[in-house]
């Protein structure tokens, strides 16, 4: 695995005969590809039905994530859904191919009621998932759980690195997910967001239990699901960065 940047720079900073003790320095393993390979994007009813059937054959909680295009679109709709379950495979679903309220999203939602659903920073993804008809009844939020446990860095990448010794590239986190077709490297990035989410959940669960904060966290997760949805933003374009600089009518039309 790659050495941390500061280790690579050591030869420039010490004398040739100096002895550098680096046995205790943390070394992480890059997570480059899903363990079972990158699945094809699901954009047909037949493929969606097969995915639901495969997930039903699995066991344990569901790792779930959604990709949005917040930096490019005023809406917060989902442009890709990633879901994984032990024994049920990893699946990438194109929600644009089906639309909100499609019967297959209803079938998927019915399946999700049977087990815990794991999300990272759930309040970001739940609105767009609910718009499609996906509304979990039992939630574990790894980001919030880590925050309650007192960890200093609670992003998905830092958590995987600190708790599991795995580094996750995040260079595609702010791309335009509404683009079609989605590039394979973007899809690979998206798949990795759920690749180890179940294992990460177990690590955070243990931290919460050890700290005596598990019940607190579970109550907070339930409160997130019970909270009423936020009202839609009025004129979201008004929140565009740099709007105060727009003076001309033709510039305003672009916004």
Language model: regions and residue ranges:
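Short acidic catalytic loops
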Residues: 62-67, 141, 193
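N-terminal accessory regions of nucleic-acid-interacting proteins
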Residues: 6-62, 66
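A broadly used, surface-exposed interaction patch
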Residues: 82, 86-107
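Short active-site oxyanion
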Residues: 90, 111-117
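C-terminal accessory/connector segments of nucleic-acid motor ATPases
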Residues: 211-255
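Acidic, Mg2+-coordinating catalytic module of metal-dependent nucleases/exonucleases
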Residues: 168-229
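Short, small-residue-biased leader/transition segments that mark boundaries at the very start
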Residues: 1-3
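Metal-dependent phosphoesterase core characteristic of DEDDh/y 3'-5' exonuclease domains
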Residues: 82-84, 88, 123-179, 187
């Amino acid at each position: 695995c790659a050495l941390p940047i500061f280790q690579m720079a050591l030869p420039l900073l010490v004398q040739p005969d100096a002895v550098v003790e680096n046995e205790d320095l943390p070394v992480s393993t890059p997570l480059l590809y899903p363990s079972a390979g990158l699945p094809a994007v699901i954009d047909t009813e037949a493929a969606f039905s097969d995915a639901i059937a495969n997930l039903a054959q699995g066991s344990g909680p569901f790792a779930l994530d959604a990709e949005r295009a917040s930096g490019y679109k005023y809406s917060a709709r989902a442009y890709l859904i990633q879901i994984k379950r032990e024994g049920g495979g990893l699946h990438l679903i194109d929600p644009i191919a089906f639309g909100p309220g499609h019967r297959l999203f209803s079938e998927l939602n019915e399946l999700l009621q049977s087990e815990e659903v794991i999300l990272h920073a759930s309040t970001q993804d739940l609105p767009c998932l609910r718009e499609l008809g996906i509304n979990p009844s039992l939630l574990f939020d790894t980001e919030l759980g880590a925050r309650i446990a007192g960890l200093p860095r609670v992003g998905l990448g830092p958590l995987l690195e600190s708790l599991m010794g795995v580094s996750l590239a995040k260079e595609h986190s702010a791309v335009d997910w509404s683009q079609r077709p989605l590039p394979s490297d973007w899809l690979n990035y998206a798949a990795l967001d759920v690749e180890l989410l179940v294992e990460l959940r177990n690590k955070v669960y243990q931290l919460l239990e050890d700290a005596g904060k598990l019940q607190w966290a579970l109550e907070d997760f339930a409160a997130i699901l019970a909270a009423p949805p936020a009202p839609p933003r009025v004129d979201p374009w008004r929140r565009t960065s740099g709007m105060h600089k727009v003076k001309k009518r033709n510039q305003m039309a672009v916004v």
